[in-house]
Amino acid sequence: MNPNFLDFEQPIADLQAKIEELRLVGDDNALNISDEISRLQDKSHALTASIFGNLTSWQIAQLARHPRRPYTLDYLEHIFTEFEELHGDRHFTDDAAIVGGVARLDDQPVMVIGHQKGRDVREKVRRNFGMPRPEGYRKACRLMEMAERFKLPILTFIDTPGAYPGIDAEERNQSEAIAWNLRVMARLKTPIVSTVIGEGGSGGALAIGVCDRLNMLQYSTYAVISPEGCASILWRTAEKAADAAEAMGITAARLRELGIVDEVIGEPLGGAHRNPAATAESVRQTLLAQLESLRGLDADSLLEQRYERLMSYGRA
């Protein structure tokens, strides 16, 4: 099966394979088969619309983890200019699972921070599969405090299965690093806009997700635990992951209904990986609009609204 397609997209993959076969036949035999190709393309588009119009929570979770889905560095490339990455937590080391630095959004200087996974095996290992250690969160905290000093808005991109649970991370006080970030972000006197671009996994996501505006891409997820983890606890088997995903309410649409998410950013048909540039433009427009809405607030009003927003969780 084509690695660009997930299991539930198999009918679409089959049609695309037929289209590619016809293109090869046309190249080899100089036959005019454009009408048949056009018909199959229309059929593929309609089938894609049908499948993606009825996705389950578990299928959305699979899309959120798609290996070709745009990551933080992809959005940095498409949306921002003059990005200058900053490294290290000034306590232990640098953590490549979190990237951050100063950049410009249009002409506005901002601080950008986000989880970063990896494409190939070497990069996945270097980025620890997007699971930060304590030094990653301490680096993020250092950059956020720097942003406050220089009066820069903070934009965070969330995409992690969770904070790294290894022994070395626990030895360096993973829980304290996350808790400290929550405390600091709640008090920062500068606008914070967070966007879930893939997986929003538990405290590992929340550690850069305390904000004034929270966005989720249409096929992203946000939850206290993975569906597999929840199923393993409740039913003693990860095979019930689909049931767990449905019960947990992990999707952007459901979290918007609950009042946790401020805006759901639409994705191209088939998911963000089908057209990263279009997805990035949608994110850019959303960020610009939200920063504009926050620009006129003084520090006290900003903190008061942030506090009220956090306290409203669970009231919907």
Curated annotation (Swiss-Prot):
| Record's subcellular location | Cytoplasm
Q: What EC number is given for this enzyme?
A: 2.1.3.15
A Gene Ontology MF term for this entry?
Answer: acetyl-CoA carboxylase activity
Q: What is catalysed by this protein?
A: N(6)-carboxybiotinyl-L-lysyl-[protein] + acetyl-CoA = N(6)-biotinyl-L-lysyl-[protein] + malonyl-CoA
Does the record carry Metal-binding as a key word?
Answer: no
For the keyword Manganese, the answer is no
Main enzyme class: transferase
Protein's pathway: Lipid metabolism; malonyl-CoA biosynthesis; malonyl-CoA from acetyl-CoA: step 1/1
* InterPro entries named among the record's database cross-references: Acetyl_CoA_COase_a_su, ClpP/crotonase-like_dom_sf, COA_CT_C
One GO cellular component term noted in the UniProt record for this chain: acetyl-CoA carboxylase complex
Provide the alphabetized UniProt keywords.
ATP-binding, Cytoplasm, Fatty acid biosynthesis, Fatty acid metabolism, Lipid biosynthesis, Lipid metabolism, Nucleotide-binding, Transferase
Return the PROSITE patterns for the record.
COA_CT_CTER
- Provide one Gene Ontology biological process annotation: malonyl-CoA biosynthetic process
Tell me where on the tree of life, at the top rank, the source sits.
Bacteria
The residues covered by the CoA carboxyltransferase C-terminal domain are 39-293
- Which protein family is named in the record? Belongs to the AccA family.
Q: What does this chain do?
A: Component of the acetyl coenzyme A carboxylase (ACC) complex. First, biotin carboxylase catalyzes the carboxylation of biotin on its carrier protein (BCCP) and then the CO(2) group is transferred by the carboxyltransferase to acetyl-CoA to form malonyl-CoA.
Complex and partners: Acetyl-CoA carboxylase is a heterohexamer composed of biotin carboxyl carrier protein (AccB), biotin carboxylase (AccC) and two subunits each of ACCase subunit alpha (AccA) and ACCase subunit beta (AccD).
Q: Supply the name of the protein.
A: Acetyl-coenzyme A carboxylase carboxyl transferase subunit alpha
Q: Which organism is it from?
A: Azotobacter vinelandii (strain DJ / ATCC BAA-1303)
